[in-house]
Amino acid sequence: MSNPDALPFLTEMTVADIISKQAKHGVSFNRRNARWYVHLLKEIIVNIDRELIPLLPKMRLDGSTYMKPFKKSGALQKWPQAYCDRVGLKREDIGGAFTCVEYVDFDPSKDARVKEALMDEGFLPPEFNVSKKPWNTFEIKKDMRKYGTYQAWYTAWMRGNAKQKQTAEMVDADIKKFLEKHFRFKTKNYMKAYVFGLGLNPNRRNPVTFDEIKKALATSNKWPTAPTNLEETLEEGLGGELGSVGSLLKRRVVAAHRLGLISGLIAKEREDGKLSAEANSCATPTFRFKHRIVVNIPSRGLFGHECRSLFESDYNSDSDHSRPFVITNVVPDGCYIRKGTNVIYEKGKPGKKDKPVGAYKYYIPAGKEVFLGYDGSGLELRMLAHYLIKECRDMLAEAIEENNPAKKALAERGLASAIMYRDILLEGDIHSHNQKLAGLPTRDNAKTFIYAFNYGAGDAKLGSIVGGGADEGSVMRARFLAENPCIAILIDRMTEKAAQGYLIGVDGRKITMRRDATGKVMVHKALNTLLQCAGAVVMKYAMMFLNKWIEKDKVRCAKVIDMHDEGQFSVNRNDVQKLKEHTELCVKKAGEYLNMECPLASDCQIGLNWMHTH
């Protein structure tokens, strides 16, 4: 019997070798432009601060406490006198022991202060860092439903056995600390943010009560501490509408992030003017890459294009690169070149504007190679379509074998909806389809919804897409699953399989499931884990096929970046067409090799730097 782990093992070894060569070769980095962008970002931050700081409340700083501020002569001691001189107090203003208190201008560089100010302005963070609590919530939830209110539950447990009493005391003490920190002397908007973080809707008609807040805290062992993924959240436009102050804060947060990112890249530059695009190809439970140095490079938003443009093709001193030349991109179906411009536009739907998707021609200076990038086209949704069909077919086969008519009917209905989902994905507009099924107001909402859904977002996160909370998210989830029986089948089957502690990937590898603090398998992450792993594995096989073809045809190129579902190359001008043909077929070949139920495809773009190719 062949070893089922042999193929995945050899795959990971081959991929690790390819990535090792990529890191050693490095990606060319435009240090000159990077330093200029650092200067521009500092100017932007200074200008924002000049407008922003006067609009924000001053920060209170508590200093030392002086129990004996006076000398025997009656004059102030050295440090109390220094404090009085600094804040403008006179000797006669001091009557005895005191604590130094100062009010200084708001400091936008302090992350915690900025988060608090954003929440004061109405920002509702969809994601929070959490602190884990030691109690088991199963019994608490059961009894909370029984008693109805937090106070009734607390009273009952205080009269219960020793373990219940100890737990109730611990829960109540922690709740009091939480309320003191986040609900005492805080603005209404700030409190709304933490209500939202607890999965409650702060904007509903009937206000949220403190009993509901206490119940939410008692029945969860993960409490929100501070907003996380702030830059990403603000860039995606999540978290609700912000006023003028909030918008300035948002712009400053993003600018500071870009400044830190580019400064960090400059510090990592090698002597040869390149950056090592290192990655551990097998460092996560889902077998996705874990990157170093070249990581989380934005492609849109403030200075997003500028960040990507810093990664360029290599210099080449060969004679065939001695002159500048112009490369031409292919105009995709449904796109056109706007008259009098060099911009490719995608035709919008009725009532929608056409949007620019890239340039038609690029000027390549003398001595420079071409930058070429490819990525998996609609990869995550194709992975979803594959598993929808596969699991419904497996369920149908089981039903026939078991002679179970009810199970067979459900499987047939699920398979029909799965095949329809795949057909719309390949030939129609899947996001408009998802918009209709989930009852969402816009197509953009649908795009955000399906990716959040696939990544295992909770009801609160889903609800935030339409400006609501956990209740709205729960309704959207229920409606989407009801309209897609195949997705409900997939989730149920994966949840059941994940309970054993692992899932089986597309190439037969075991995917170890994450566990919580108590050691319990986190089965609610099964779909997210499965889809992430499938996408990562497919792109690894595509990488191997591509590498094999490159070596066979002796294509003069070097792989310089690999980022999840995309790969970037620096390629000799005369070999661009060869490499382009291979990149457009490698993902399709990987799908066929792995017997995917949904055909796979890849897109390829060429240019001078990473901004042009993705």
UniProtKB/Swiss-Prot annotation:
GO molecular function terms attached to this record: DNA binding; DNA-directed DNA polymerase activity; exonuclease activity
Keyword Thylakoid found: no
Catalyzed chemical reaction(s): DNA(n) + a 2'-deoxyribonucleoside 5'-triphosphate = DNA(n+1) + diphosphate
Protein name: DNA-directed DNA polymerase
Classification via PROSITE patterns: DNA_POLYMERASE_A
Organism: Escherichia phage Phieco32 (Escherichia coli phage phi32)
InterPro entries the UniProt entry points to: DNA-dir_DNA_pol_A_palm_dom, DNA/RNA_pol_sf, DNA_polymerase_A
An individual GO BP term: double-strand break repair
